[in-house]
Amino acid sequence: MLITVLKSKIHNARVTVCNVDYEGSLSLDEELIKQANLRPYEKVLVANVTNGERFETYIIPAPANSREVGLNGAAARSAVVGDRVIVMAFAMKEPDEEVDTTVLIMDEENNIKEVKKLKA
């Protein structure tokens, strides 16, 4: 039996761009993608802390060190610039298998304030 566990989380990032007319979904600073142990085009769950909405989408890389957290296409209807969001990715594993979970805690300017390494 496989179970689904949290693999990566970016907590309290600020939305910097909303572009309904852009092809793509969640544009995320390439450096944040690496630090959070995510991959371009990986499926993610996004929770908008500001309005309570949740939606699934995928990651597209934004320029490294831009601190961009952009919602594009239909996802842009789910937030406004300045909203706080949580980005989560999951992995499937055997119950006795260990998964390294990475959690990035962000500050107001989308700089990494803290990195947590957990075992799932």
UniProtKB/Swiss-Prot annotation:
One GO CC term on file: cytosol
GO molecular function: aspartate 1-decarboxylase activity
Positions with a binding annotation for substrate: T57, G73, A74, A75
UniProt PTM comment: Is synthesized initially as an inactive proenzyme, which is activated by self-cleavage at a specific serine bond to produce a beta-subunit with a hydroxyl group at its C-terminus and an alpha-subunit with a pyruvoyl group at its N-terminus.
Cell location: Cytoplasm
Pathway per the UniProt entry: Cofactor biosynthesis; (R)-pantothenate biosynthesis; beta-alanine from L-aspartate: step 1/1
EC number annotated for this UniProt entry: 4.1.1.11
Highest taxon, organism lineage: Bacteria
Residues modified to Pyruvic acid (Ser): S25
General function of this protein: Catalyzes the pyruvoyl-dependent decarboxylation of aspartate to produce beta-alanine.
Name this polypeptide is given: Aspartate 1-decarboxylase
Annotated source species: Coprothermobacter proteolyticus (strain ATCC 35245 / DSM 5265 / OCM 4 / BT)
